[in-house]
C-alpha cells in the first residue's frame, strides 16, 4: 500500500473517530458561545466565512499552485517532446539518452507536486470546512425567510457547484464506466437532497465562503499571470 494511501486512510479514520465521539461537536459548541457575543447575524456569518477562508488559505494556495504546475509541466513536456522529434522515434520507443535526462530534469523541477501533499491539502480543507460548518449549525441565528427563498438559494448553490465540477462531469460522462456514472449520480442525488435541507444561515455561510474563495482565486490567477509574464520578459 502506498504511503499516500496510508496517510489518507489514517486521517479519515481520525476524522471519523473525532466526529463519532462528539469531539467535533463539543469544540463547535464551545466556539459558538464566543460567536454568540456578536449580536448582528450578518457580522456573525461574515466572520465565520472569513475565518474558514483564512484557515483554508494555505491548502487553497497549494492546490492552486499544483494546478498551475501541472499545466506548466504539461506544456514543458510537449515542448520537450517536440525538441526530440529529430533524434527519437516515439512510436517505436527508440529514445536517445539525452531525452531520459531531460525528462528526469523536468520531473525534478516539479518535485514539490506530490500526491501525498495534494491529499493532505484536500483533507485539511475538508476538516476545516466541516468544523466551521458545525459551528454555524451550533450558533442560534435569528434569520427567518420563506421556504421558497431558502429553496432558491439551495438551487443556486447546487448550480454553482455543478458549474465548478463541469470539467470532471464532462470527462465522466464521456469516458467513465457505467459503475462510476451510477456511483457519481447516487452521490450527487444524496448531496442535492442534503443541501435542500440546509437552513438559511447555513446556505448564506456557504455562499459567502464560495464568494470569498472565488475572489481569492481570481486575485491569485491575476497575480500568477503577471508574475509569469514578467519572467517571460
Swiss-Prot record:
Residue ranges of coiled coil: none
A cellular-component GO term for this protein: plasma membrane
Main location: membrane
Domain of life: Bacteria
Residue spans crossing the bilayer: 7-27, 46-66, 116-136, 145-165, 176-198, 203-220
Subcellular location: Cell membrane
Keyword terms, alphabetized: Antibiotic biosynthesis, Bacteriocin biosynthesis, Cell membrane, Membrane, Transmembrane, Transmembrane helix
Induction: Transcription is highly induced by oxygen limitation and is under dual and independent control of Spo0A-AbrB and ResDE.
Membrane topology reported for the UniProt record: Multi-pass membrane protein
Keyword check for Cell membrane: yes
Keyword Cell membrane in record: yes
Gene Ontology BP, a term: bacteriocin biosynthetic process
Role summary: Involved in the production of the bacteriocin subtilosin.
UniProt-recorded name of the protein: Antilisterial bacteriocin subtilosin biosynthesis protein AlbG
Gene designation per UniProt: albG
Amino acid at each position: 500500500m502506498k504511503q499516500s494511501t496510508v496517510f489518507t486512510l489514517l486521517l479519515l479514520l481520525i476524522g471519523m473517530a473525532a466526529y463519532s465521539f462528539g469531539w467535533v461537536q463539543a469544540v463547535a459548541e464551545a466556539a459558538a458561545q464566543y460567536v454568540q457575543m456578536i449580536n448582528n447575524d450578518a457580522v456573525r456569518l461574515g466572520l465565520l466565512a472569513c475565518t474558514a477562508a483564512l484557515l483554508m488559505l494555505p491548502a487553497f494556495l497549494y492546490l492552486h499552485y499544483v494546478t498551475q504546475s501541472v499545466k506548466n509541466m504539461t506544456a514543458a513536456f510537449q515542448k520537450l517532446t517536440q525538441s526530440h522529434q529529430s533524434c527519437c522515434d516515439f512510436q517505436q520507443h527508440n529514445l536517445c539518452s539525452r531525452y531520459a535526462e531531460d525528462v528526469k530534469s523536468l520531473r525534478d523541477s516539479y518535485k514539490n507536486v506530490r500526491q501525498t501533499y495534494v491529499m493532505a491539502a484536500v483533507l485539511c480543507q475538508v476538516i476545516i470546512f466541516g468544523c466551521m460548518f458545525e459551528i454555524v449549525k451550533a450558533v442560534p441565528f435569528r434569520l427567518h425567510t420563506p421556504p421558497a427563498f431558502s429553496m432558491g438559494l439551495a438551487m443556486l448553490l447546487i448550480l454553482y457547484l455543478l458549474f465548478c465540477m463541469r470539467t470532471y462531469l464532462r470527462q465522466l460522462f464521456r469516458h467513465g464506466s457505467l459503475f462510476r456514472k451510477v456511483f457519481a449520480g447516487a452521490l450527487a442525488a444524496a448531496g442535492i437532497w442534503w443541501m435542500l435541507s440546509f437552513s438559511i444561515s447555513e446556505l448564506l455561510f456557504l455562499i459567502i465562503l464560495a464568494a470569498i474563495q472565488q475572489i481569492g482565486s481570481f486575485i491569485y490567477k491575476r497575480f500568477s499571470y503577471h508574475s509569469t509574464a514578467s519572467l517571460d520578459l
